[in-house]
């Protein structure tokens, strides 16, 4: 589990693409501290398992499903990526619950600056937007952010300059694709609630006759 508080911005050192998967090697520093093979690191919000460690980087496998569902396939050498190690049991919970399982991809439709904040408007599919609520949490490329407004085709977030400086948001432009993970709590609530679809009536004339009516 992660919190959406980015520890550092790494860079893609190499990408080895296979027919149905890829191996990413990411140049990093902070997230290598105490990390062992088999540990989890979120790369742009996607939970990846460390398969190899080097003095200045780590390598991780990316499966076919992840490549299809996320924006990782668009990474190139030297691309900046947000990195976060899995939260330890005694760690501080600074953001919100982030599983590292991306729901899909959004696209930056607009970037606007005002006196104190930078606003990002993200367009996304309706399947993602159904879980996006105003004042709720959302993860954009591994960054825990608060939804400022929800629109029919997307949503907006307001970020402080510190967040932009400490993440790869400072290298994002209009038209860029970003990984999105909605709040997992909403998904569980939806799953537990009774379905709104009425159950099919199984009472038939033949059944009534068999029962003596």
Across the structure, where does each feature detected by a protein language model lie?
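Conserved loop->alpha-helix
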Residues: 1-213
């Amino acid at each position: 589990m992660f919190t959406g508080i980015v520890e550092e911005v790494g860079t893609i050192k190499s990408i080895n693409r296979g027919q149905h998967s890829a191996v990413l090697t990411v140049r990093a520093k902070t997230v290598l501290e105490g990390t062992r093979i088999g540990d989890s690191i979120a790369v742009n919000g996607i939970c990846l398992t460390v398969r190899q460690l080097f003095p200045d980087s780590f390598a991780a496998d990316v499966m076919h499903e992840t490549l299809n569902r996320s924006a990782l396939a668009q990474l190139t050498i030297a691309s900046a990526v947000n990195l976060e190690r899995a939260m330890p049991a005694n760690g501080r919970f600074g953001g919100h619950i982030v599983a590292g399982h991306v729901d899909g991809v959004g696209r930056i439709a607009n970037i606007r600056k005002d006196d104190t904040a930078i606003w990002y408007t993200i367009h996304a599919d309706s399947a993602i937007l159904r879980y996006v609520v105003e004042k709720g949490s959302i993860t954009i490329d591994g960054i825990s952010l608060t939804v400022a407004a929800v629109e029919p085709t997307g949503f907006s977030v307001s970020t402080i300059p510190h967040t932009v400086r400490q993440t790869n948001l400072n290298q994002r432009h209009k038209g860029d694709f970003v990984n999105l993970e909605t709040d997992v709590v909403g998904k569980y609530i939806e799953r537990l609630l009774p379905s709104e679809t009425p159950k099919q009536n199984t009472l038939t004339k033949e059944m009534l006759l068999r029962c003596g009516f």
